[in-house]
């Protein structure tokens, strides 16, 4: 990187904040949170790579399933199964909305 130390630190902080937002999304999806909660988190993720979001959600739910049976985690994996390359962020929004309506 050609960035100075302060710039690298700022980039690192932004990446960590994004990762935390995606994990927050995962937690809300697993607990069966409301669409109101989810859309606030999604608004903060709108500029992020949709495929990165999808893969974190899949990994989070996979980790839950490998520990114990969890039908909700399996359902979330099913909703996030397809790659987002052709559709982008609207796919993430639709998947989250669909999950909130399958309580």
Model-inferred region functions:
Residues 1-103:
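AAA+ P-loop NTPase domains with strong preference for DNA replication initiators
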């Amino acid at each position: 990187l050609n960035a100075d130390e302060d710039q690298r630190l700022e980039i690192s902080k932004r990446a960590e904040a994004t990762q935390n937002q995606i994990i927050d999304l995962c937690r809300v999806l697993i607990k069966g949170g409301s669409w109101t909660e989810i859309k606030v988190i999604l608004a903060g993720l709108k500029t992020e790579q949709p495929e990165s979001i999808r893969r974190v959600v899949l990994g989070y739910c996979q980790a839950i399933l490998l520990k114990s049976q969890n039908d909700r985690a399996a359902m979330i994996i099913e909703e996030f199964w397809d790659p987002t390359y052709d559709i982008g962020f609207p796919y993430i929004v639709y998947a989250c909305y669909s999950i909130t309506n399958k309580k």
